[in-house]
């Protein structure tokens, strides 16, 4: 059956290899079940509901990828996209999380149309390979920066950013930041020793060390300051809590939003999501070395369609945009080549719903090393960018995309600057003919965005 559905022999793989790859992928991205509730919880959403929604959306999206695209890619709530929803749309724009989810649902429907009409595929193929690699590196730095912030290591200071003063509030913020550094060290050791699931083991070890610190008095829970007990509440998952987010994207009071403002939110999500999703897919395919010599991904159309369906379904369940995860590359590294890898990962996400109380108790300082490590894995692509002086029309746009993402706290801004600079530099140096026509269209749209939005 597996041979008929996934064409294993054609892809030179076996059921055993695919199963191991699927398990590996899940182990390397299971941290999202702890991180996403932490990020979206800042909007007022119930963390258990977010975890269940994230797990179910991950399962659905990954199964779509398995059967529609036959690719070894797993999907879950995208890092960067969840931050955009929590810290920009809700905290920045002042909208409710219900409005944000409805915007995600609608832009998911729009994405389905764009995927069916080949527009997203055309955009993906129009972006030059060097810029794609720059996007992958930039996303890595962005994710690492979020990890440094969540850990408390990176703080707001007179120099815009700085490192925490460990002696101040040592028994709360100080010890959490220190535990993040320790967790990062062990995660790096696990990776160096080529342990499967190194990121997940790093999270668990950091959490255990935190609980030991609480027992010995090094960590003192201070709920009023946002520092809670690190011990989980044991028991069965309360699946009824999913009702707190399920379908809430349709429970919106438009009188408090305004149709014009709502359209702006949808466009913001659409704009960020299309380029964040493409950026992440670029990062996954680049890291997994699945792009062809022209920088194109074979079979991208059904993959984009699966991604789009998962986004709308995830919004109904109660989570931010669902997208392809760069950790899918870990399963590919083990030998995963078909949708069977994704099938195994999807099933494991479904099983994970039984352990929601444990995942929701994992503190942000324990998941921070995972974010920093994922950032490191993506930044490695920078070695594939040619920075020679005779290649500046390619490398400078990639460089601008890299530095813009973490410094402007936006993946889409990095892509915007990368595309605009690529077009302008090639035009100014007489190389305009090599630029894909769609790149000119994108550059104009980005410029108009800066003028009118």
Q: What are the residue ranges of the model-derived segments?
A:
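Loop-to-helix transition at the N-terminal end of transmembrane alpha-helices
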Residues: 43-63
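Helix-loop-helix hairpins and the membrane-proximal interhelical loops
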Residues: 1-49, 164-168, 203-301, 446-448
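Hydrophobic/aromatic residues within the transmembrane alpha-helices of Major Facilitator Superfamily
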Residues: 23-30, 60-63, 67, 148, ...
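Juxtamembrane transmembrane-helix boundary signature
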Residues: 58-79, 110
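Helix-loop-helix junctions within the multi-pass membrane cores of secondary transporters/permeases
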Residues: 2-36, 57, 78-87, 91-139, ...
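Membrane-embedded alpha-helical modules
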Residues: 93-208, 212, 343-453
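Residue-level signature of catalytic and energy-coupling elements of molecular machines
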Residues: 19, 39, 123, 197, ...
């Amino acid at each position: 059956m597996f041979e008929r559905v996934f064409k294993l022999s054609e892809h030179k793989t076996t059921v055993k290899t695919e199963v191991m790859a699927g398990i590996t992928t899940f182990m390397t991205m299971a941290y999202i079940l702890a991180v996403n509730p932490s990020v979206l919880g800042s909007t007022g959403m119930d963390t258990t509901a977010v975890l269940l929604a994230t797990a179910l959306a991950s399962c659905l999206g990954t199964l779509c990828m398995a059967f529609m695209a036959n690719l070894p890619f797993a999907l879950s709530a995208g890092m960067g996209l969840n931050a955009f929803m929590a810290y920009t749309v809700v905290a920045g724009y002042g909208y409710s999380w219900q409005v944000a989810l409805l915007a995600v649902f609608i832009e998911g429907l729009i994405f389905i149309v764009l995927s069916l009409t080949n527009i997203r595929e055309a955009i993906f193929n129009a972006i030059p390979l060097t810029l794609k690699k720059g996007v992958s590196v930039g996303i890595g730095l962005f994710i690492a920066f979020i990890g440094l912030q969540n850990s408390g290591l990176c703080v707001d200071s007179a120099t815009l950013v700085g490192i925490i003063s460990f002696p101040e509030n040592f028994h709360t913020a100080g010890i959490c930041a220190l535990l993040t550094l320790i967790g990062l060290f062990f995660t790096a050791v696990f990776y160096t020793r080529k342990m499967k699931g190194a990121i997940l083991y790093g999270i668990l070890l950091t959490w255990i060390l935190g609980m030991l610190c609480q027992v010995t008095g090094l960590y003192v829970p201070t709920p009023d300051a946002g520092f809670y007990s690190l011990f989980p509440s044991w028991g069965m998952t309360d699946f009824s809590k999913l009702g707190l987010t399920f379908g809430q994207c349709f429970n919106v009071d438009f009188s408090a939003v305004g149709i014009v403002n709502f359209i702006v939110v949808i466009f913001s999500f659409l704009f960020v999501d299309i380029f964040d999703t493409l950026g992440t897919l670029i990062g996954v395919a680049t890291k997994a070395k699945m792009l062809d010599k022209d920088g194109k991904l074979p079979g991208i159309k059904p993959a984009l369609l699966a991604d789009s369906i998962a986004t709308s379904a995830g919004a109904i369940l109660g989570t931010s945009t669902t997208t392809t995860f760069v950790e899918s590359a870990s399963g590919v590294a083990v030998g995963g080549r078909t949708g069977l890898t994704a099938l195994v990962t999807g099933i494991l996400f479904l099983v994970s719903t039984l352990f929601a109380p444990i995942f929701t108790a994992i503190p942000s300082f324990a998941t921070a090393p995972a974010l920093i490590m994922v950032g490191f894995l993506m930044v490695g692509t920078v070695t594939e960018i040619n920075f020679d002086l005779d290649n500046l029309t390619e490398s400078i746009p990639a460089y601008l995309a890299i530095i813009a993402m973490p410094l402007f706290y936006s993946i889409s801004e990095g892509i915007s600057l990368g595309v605009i600079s690529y077009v302008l530099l090639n035009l100014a140096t007489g190389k305009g003919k090599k630029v894909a026509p769609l790149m000119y269209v994108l550059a104009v749209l980005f410029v108009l965005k800066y003028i009118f939005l």
